[in-house]
């Protein structure tokens, strides 16, 4: 999931319609996209997630909104990295593929690394692909690979020194 979240939104031209979903903190990240859409007079829908929205309300409202969109729409989500991580399965379930969505995130994200030796999961903050870390169970030094398992919701950690 780390490799899908960007910290700066990139404008993708030529889409049928643009969908923007953000909260107060994500607004600054998505502002350049809004300005481009307005200057080009492109069609877009905008959904703002307020402070008083619970995660369950957010999921239900987002699901209803996205299910009513037409094919050819492009989605920008500008939320905290943890919120993006939690919403991604819902977005994919609705039918948006990786090339139809930009996850623009802020803040820290907790990721897991799967140890190839003892098969335990170690949780880390702001994981970097290619970095080394110790397994919390067997204490072996692992090299974090870019292979991500959706089954375990974790990156594969290979033995760093043989």
Short names for language-model regions:
Residues 85, 89-162:
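Cys/His-clustered metal-coordination modules, chiefly Zn-binding fingers
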């Amino acid at each position: 999931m780390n490799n899908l979240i960007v910290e700066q939104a990139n404008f993708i031209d030529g889409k049928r319609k643009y969908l923007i979903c953000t909260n107060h903190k994500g607004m600054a990240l998505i502002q350049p996209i809004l300005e481009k859409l307005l200057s080009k007079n492109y069609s877009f829908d905008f959904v703002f997630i307020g402070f008083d929205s619970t995660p369950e309300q957010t999921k239900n409202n987002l699901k209803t909104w996205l299910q009513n969109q037409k094919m050819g729409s492009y989605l920008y989500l500008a939320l905290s990295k943890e919120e993006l991580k939690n919403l991604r399965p819902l977005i994919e379930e609705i039918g948006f593929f990786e090339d139809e969505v930009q996850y623009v995130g802020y803040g820290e994200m907790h990721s897991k690394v799967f140890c190839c030796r003892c098969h335990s999961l170690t949780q880390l903050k702001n994981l970097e692909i290619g970095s080394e870390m110790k397994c919390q169970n067997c204490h072996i030094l692992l090299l974090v690979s870019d292979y991500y398992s959706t089954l375990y919701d974790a990156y594969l950690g290979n033995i760093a020194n043989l």
